[in-house]
């Protein structure tokens, strides 16, 4: 028994040493090939590219800091009571039977008129950040990020092949490799710096703003309850916006996509229990190509292409627009 225990301890020690060496290798590669911004922290890069009037949303700032120790337990995404729609070539093509929602009374989708003051919507806002941190760009760029390198990626981050977490990692890589939907641009940002670059390039300006839903003066979740809209304002006059959604991965990765024919709002909400939420809402103004059996149409009782379909975004999503 002692011999077996000693052998197990030796194997664990070797694994820990291998992981430490991998981290050292990544850091050395980053230091040697980081480019002109190699000495900048992600926060400094943000400030160097974006104007001072672009504050960093808490959904991003809480993911800063050293990306190590990373999380080998990437976990399955927990999406609360909202429709589970993954990005893909047919993102709006799922029928209601293919979508997941626990409570049919939840305001997953609503009409744009519901953003008028005094309107009430049943909602559940959950803090669903996975807890994994951003890697600095140099380190992220030194790590393979491709489905063809899956086995190497699993080994680097201590994810057991064949496990549920390995399947999650694989799905994230495959989703990131899917082509953009018609009329959209997309990219998976493996660092904050690459997210900023994609957004500025896609919107054609650095004069942009970023927003996320946040619970005022409160951490964690709020119960599912009725919220009253106390005010709403357009984030921008343009119909373009970029939404960045977190992906399940050993370190922070965001799927960002630019969409046309949309309107973004910032809405002030107050729950029945007094909870205050500053929420971001996105309204899709062209739904003509959506699946007629999509949950939005069944919930709202409307047909594709007739009225804008709106939804609030959860606190882990970042929405970017041009300023003004």
UniProtKB/Swiss-Prot annotation:
Keyword field contains S-adenosyl-L-methionine: no
Segment forming the signal sequence: 1-30
Keyword annotations: Signal
Annotated disulfide bonds: none
Tissue specificity remark: Expressed in panicles.
Domain of life: Eukaryota
Residue intervals of the BURP domain: 109-323
Statement: the UniProt record of this protein carries the keyword Disulfide bond: no
InterPro entries per record: BURP (IPR044816), BURP_dom (IPR004873)
Coiled coil: none
Protein name in the entry: BURP domain-containing protein 5
Gene responsible for this protein: BURP5
